[in-house]
C-alpha cells in the first residue's frame, strides 16, 4: 500500500511537471521567440530543458504507469470499463505529447544552432501548440481518473 501510494504520488508529480513545462513553454516562452524578444541561446536552453524533462518524464511515467496498471487493472478492466478506457486514452495522449514535443524541439533547436530565432520558432509553432493542447487534454483525463466514484 505504501509503495502504491508513493508510485501514484511520484507519477502525479512527474505528470504535473511535464504538462506544466509544456504549457509554460507554449504559452509564455514561445510567443517571445516568435516576436524575436528572446535571445536564441536562451530559447535554445529552455527548449533543451523541455526536451530533457519530456524524455525523463516519458520514461518515468511509462514505468510508474505500468506499475499502477499492472497492480490495479486486468486486461478486461482496461478494455471493458470507462476507467480502463481513460487509462488507455491517457497512454495515447502521453505518446502524442512526447512526439509533439520532440518534433517541435527538434525544429526549434535546428535553427537556434544557427543563431536564428523567428524562423525556428515559426517552424516549431504547430508542434508546440499541439503539445499544449495535448497537455491540457491529459490534465482533463487525469481529473476524470481522479474523481471519486459515483455515490460518495
Describe the residue ranges of each PLM region.
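Polytopic transmembrane helical bundles with strong interfacial aromatic enrichment
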Residues: 1-152
Amino acid at each position: 500500500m505504501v509503495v502504491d501510494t508513493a508510485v501514484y504520488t511520484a507519477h502525479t508529480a512527474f505528470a504535473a511537471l511535464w504538462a506544466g513545462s509544456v504549457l509554460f513553454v507554449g504559452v509564455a516562452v514561445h510567443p517571445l521567440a516568435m516576436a524575436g524578444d528572446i535571445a536564441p541561446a536562451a530559447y535554445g536552453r529552455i527548449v533543451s530543458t523541455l526536451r530533457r524533462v519530456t524524455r525523463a518524464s516519458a520514461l518515468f511515467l511509462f514505468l510508474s504507469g505500468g506499475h499502477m496498471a499492472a497492480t490495479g487493472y486486468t486486461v478486461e478492466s482496461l478494455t471493458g470499463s470507462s476507467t480502463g478506457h481513460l487509462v488507455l486514452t491517457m497512454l495515447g495522449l502521453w505518446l502524442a505529447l512526447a512526439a509533439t514535443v520532440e518534433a517541435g524541439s527538434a525544429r526549434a533547436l535546428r535553427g537556434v544552432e544557427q543563431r536564428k530565432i523567428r524562423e525556428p520558432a515559426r517552424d516549431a509553432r504547430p508542434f508546440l501548440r499541439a503539445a499544449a493542447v495535448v497537455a491540457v487534454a491529459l490534465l482533463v483525463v487525469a481529473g476524470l481518473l481522479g474523481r471519486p466514484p459515483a455515490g460518495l
